[in-house]
Design a protein with these regions (language model features):
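Membrane-interface alpha helices of multi-pass inner-membrane proteins
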Residues: 120, 152-179, 208
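Short hydrophobic/aromatic helix or loop-helix immediately within or flanking a transmembrane segment
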Residues: 46-71, 163
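Membrane-lumen/periplasm interface segments of specific transmembrane helices
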Residues: 179-183, 187-216
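Membrane-interface transmembrane helices that cradle and orient dolichyl/undecaprenyl
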Residues: 137-152
Length: 216
């Protein structure tokens, strides 16, 4: 159902909003390789389109790889979002089920499918692609706290790192997780140790990931 909605919206937006779909995909031509993107993205930011010039390099790199595997076309971006956006429903359902129950999780999916801004931009805006990493990171954090798992905490850090590589909106997750830990200290100190441990491990993994990228 999600994919059918995305295809329908793409057909409409492809006619009425062609300029929106050109964001990011038009910037692929400015780079010759993945290494070029990693090394020179900041230096070339001023020559990129509005969104690409104010976002991390993840989206352009993803589209660069996609165009090498398939072809250079605006629709490559649309189909990338069409086929990836539905996967957002998986961590969203798991997160809602973990925090509440299966009934609420099902309602969450229904609301997601009929939310106007999500429906209208889900197949032409890269935010639909970014949301997969944001929601997955949130689910992994709560799952790590509940299971008290260091391995899941490391995966949380890696997921946040990947999410930050895609969008600066990931900064909110850090603020949210820190605020949540603070509230836990005030309201439920029995769970404080788990929150602090997961926060430290995931945060450390996040920082280490980018330090390694910088050194390499």
């Amino acid at each position: 159902l999600k994919m059918l909605i995305d295809v329908s919206v793409t057909m409409v937006n492809g006619v009425f909003l062609p300029q929106g779909i050109n964001e990011y995909i038009n910037d692929v031509q400015h780079f010759n390789s993945v290494g070029d993107i990693l090394r020179n993205y900041a230096f070339k930011a001023k020559m990129l389109t509005r969104h690409a010039g104010t976002h991390p390099p993840g989206a352009v790199m993803t589209l660069w790889l996609a165009t090498r595997l398939f072809t250079y076309s605006d629709m490559v971006k649309a189909f990338l979002i069409i086929f990836s956006a539905p996967f957002t429903l998986i961590p969203m359902y798991l997160l809602a089920r973990q925090l509440y129950d299966k009934k609420i999780a099902t309602y969450t999916l229904v609301v997601y499918l009929v939310t106007p801004n999500i429906v209208m931009y889900t197949a032409t805006c890269m935010d639909a692609f970014f949301s997969l990493f944001l929601i997955t990171s949130t689910y992994l954090f709560f799952n790590s706290v509940e299971r008290k798992s260091a391995v899941l905490a490391v995966l949380t850090g890696l997921s946040i790192s990947l999410s930050m590589f895609m969008t600066f909106a990931t900064t909110f997750l850090g603020v949210y997780f820190i605020s949540l830990t603070t509230v836990t200290y005030l309201g439920n100190r029995k769970e404080l140790k788990s929150h602090v441990t997961v926060l430290a491990i995931s945060g450390g993994t996040f920082c280490l990931t980018y330090l390694i990228m910088y050194w390499v």
